[in-house]
């Protein structure tokens, strides 16, 4: 039976009880002791009435009336108990109704809370989904195409690459980056994929890095090959493979870098048991300067002669060259060489392999080490300007080598911001792969300062930054 039906039934009982009480009270009133004559009154009535009523019968009648009165009182008492029971039941019912009301209210509130929680959960889920999409979007923007499925595993490619320069702190930087918990380990620092082993394929390259089974625990992946910056083939290859990878470039005072490379090459020859270097630093510097000048001059004259020949052929002429553009030096650069850009830098690689440019050829190229390039690798503007044909400047983080010695914490902190990884304590900083050598003599030092001056000024203007090198 429902609560409402119970309430209606109790109300009917109460109404009925009131009616019964009224009737009984009326009967009680008419049969109450004051309504019946006492024995003295009856005796007096008998004596005065003269009708001669039987006194015993009157007493019996009075007893019967008293018995009825007692019975009525008992019934009234029972009725009183019944009314109390009814009131108690009514109170209990009311309490039950109140409890049910409160329970219903609590249920409603709980349901509202559940709905709110559900909505909040939905909102949270939606927010998490949005955040997840944003993370995926951000990840796809910063680190796209870095993982490929191969034989049930994910082989991941670098998110960042240290592209140069040689003898400018790349070993130090790679050592401390490998200590960061958010950066994956690689098999070796210099992989040389984009300049020397590109034909081995992308799977060969990917196997040099830490492998993953899912993207959930993926770390940043990087490598450091300082010879990438000075190879004209590297930039287009890297752009084709990892066009959104973050690039890191370390630059050192070009005078000091050139000398450091020379002494490093001597040690390298000893370690590899190669023939010793028979030329002094000064001799190699002047010879390389002649190669660069001859190659560039020959290339410029060849371009001018080529334009003249095309113009003469267009006008129906015989295509003869002017006297001032003829000569053997046009063969210094292969005329069928495919240009990556109009920058002279792209021709340097062919120049250093040309015996006609340099009477003793590429001195250490035949012994397996590219020592040649002490000057060219220090012409930073020419190299960076070429790379900007493929990568925007904001994608390249440039570190001044001299800052590594004076403020290594600041250098790594700025790099962590660039890579979007947490700041950590690297502990004590120690120099890495430092080559000790005697100081440079003043004459060759002055020559190099003057030689690099124009390139340095172009670099400062390009980056809007003064590196405060020797001038």
UniProtKB/Swiss-Prot annotation:
Show which residues sit on the Cytoplasmic side of the membrane: 1-12
Assigned EC number: 2.8.2.-
Q: What is its main location?
A: membrane
Glycosylated residues, per the record, are: 47, 324, 344
Membrane-spanning intervals of the chain: 13-33
Q: Quote one Gene Ontology molecular function term.
A: sulfotransferase activity
Relate the protein's function as given in its record: Sulfotransferase involved in intracellular killing of bacteria.
Q: What is this protein called?
A: Membrane-associated sulfotransferase kil1
What is the scientific name of the source organism? Answer: Dictyostelium discoideum (Social amoeba)
Gene name in the database record: kil1
